[in-house]
Amino acid sequence: MKKLLISAVSILVICLGMLYSRDFIDSSNSGDKQTLTIFNWGEYIDPDLIKKFEEETGISVVYETFDSNEAMLTKIQAGSTPYDIVIPSDYMIKKMKKLNLLKKLDHSKIEGFDNIDPQFKDKSFDHNNEFSIPYFWGTLGILYNKTKVPEDLTFEKWNNLWDTRLANNVLLIDGAREMMGIALQSEGNSVNDTNEVNLNLAERKLELLHPNVKAINADEKKMLMINNEAWVSVVFSGDAKAIMEENENMVYALPKEGTNLWFDNIVIPKTSKNEEGAYKFINFMLRPENAAKNSEFIGYATPNTKAKELLPEETTSDEQFYPDLESFGNRAEVYEDLEKKMLQFYNDLFLKFKINNRK
C-alpha cells in the first residue's frame, strides 16, 4: 500500500487552490463578465459551437439544461442562478413577458436578424421580436416503422393511433398540452380549447388509447424506435429526423387534422449579469455557418434563411421537416398561454389518463 506524504508546502498549495476555486465560483455567480450562463433544453446545441464561441470571445460558458418549459420557469422565478441566455418555447415566452421576467432586446446590438425568414418574425407571442430571437421551429407528428405497421396505415390522421392492430406498440409524449391537443385535434377542436366539456371528452378518448400504449416517455422513445421495440411514436420533428437517420424503415407523418407548430426562441432574462456576452452569443448563433451547423447536429428546422442555403438540399426540400406552412392554414396551431386554472385542468386530466394507463 502506497503512503501519501503531504508536506506543509503541499497543504498550503491545496488551500490556496481551494480559495481560488471558491473565488472563481463566487465571481461567476456575481456576474463575472467572462462567464455566460446558458439555460437550454437537453441536447439542444452542438457542443462544438460552445467551444468555438468560447475560443472566439474568451467567455467561459456555464451550460445547464431543463426538460420542460414549466421546470425552466420555476428555476427562473426562483432567481437563484443569474442566467444570461434561455431558450423557451412560444407560449412560455408570452407568459414570461407577462411576469416581467425578460429584458427587452436592443436590436441595434443584434447582427444577423435579417437572416431570419420573415414568416418566423413578429409572431403573436412576441410582436416585433421585442424580447426574443428565433432559434428552431418544428412540428408534432407521428413516426412509424413502415415494415411493422399494416400497409393501409399511413397516419394521415391522428385517429390512426387508435387502430386496434397497434396493440402495445405506440409511444406517447409525456406532455399534457401535446397529448390533450392530439385528442382535441382528432375531433376537430383546437389544441387551445378551453371548453371543459370538450376537454373531458378528449381525456375519455385518450383512455381508449390505453391498449395501444407501450410507454409514455421522453428520450427513451428514441432507442425504442431505433431498435424496433415499438412501431409508432408521437414525436417532435427533430427527434423524428434523428431516429430516421438511425433506422431507414421510419417514416414521419403530419396528420391532416392539424399539428402543433412550435417555435423555440432565444431570450435574455432579467437575471442576466452578462448582457454584453448574451448579445455576443445571439449574434454568434445568427451567423449562417453556425446556425447551419447547429441545425445539422440537432436535426430541427432552422428559421435562418442564409443557414438554410448551406444545408443539403435533400434536407431543406423534405416537406416532412420543412413543410409549407401556408398549406396547413389554421390547422398548424401554436400553443397559447393558458390561464393558470385552465392549464391545471389540462394537467389534471392528463395525470388521470397516465394513472389509469398503469392499471
Can you describe what each PLM-predicted range is?
Residues P269-N330:
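Mature extracytoplasmic/periplasmic domains
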Residues K97-L105, H127-E130, I243-L254, S317-E319:
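Ligand-binding "clamshell"
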Residues S7, L19-K95, S108:
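Early extracytoplasmic/lumenal segment of secretory-pathway proteins
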Residues M1-L4:
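Positively charged n-region of N-terminal signal peptides that target proteins for export
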Residues M92-K95, I226, W231-N249:
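A ligand-binding cleft/hinge motif common to bilobed small-molecule-binding domains
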Residues L199-L208, E246-K270:
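Periplasmic-binding protein-like
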Residues E326-K359:
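Conserved C-terminal helix/tail region of periplasmic/extracytoplasmic solute-binding proteins
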Residues P82, I87-I93, K97-N212, N217-E229:
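Extracytoplasmic ligand-binding site segments that recognize negatively charged/polar headgroups
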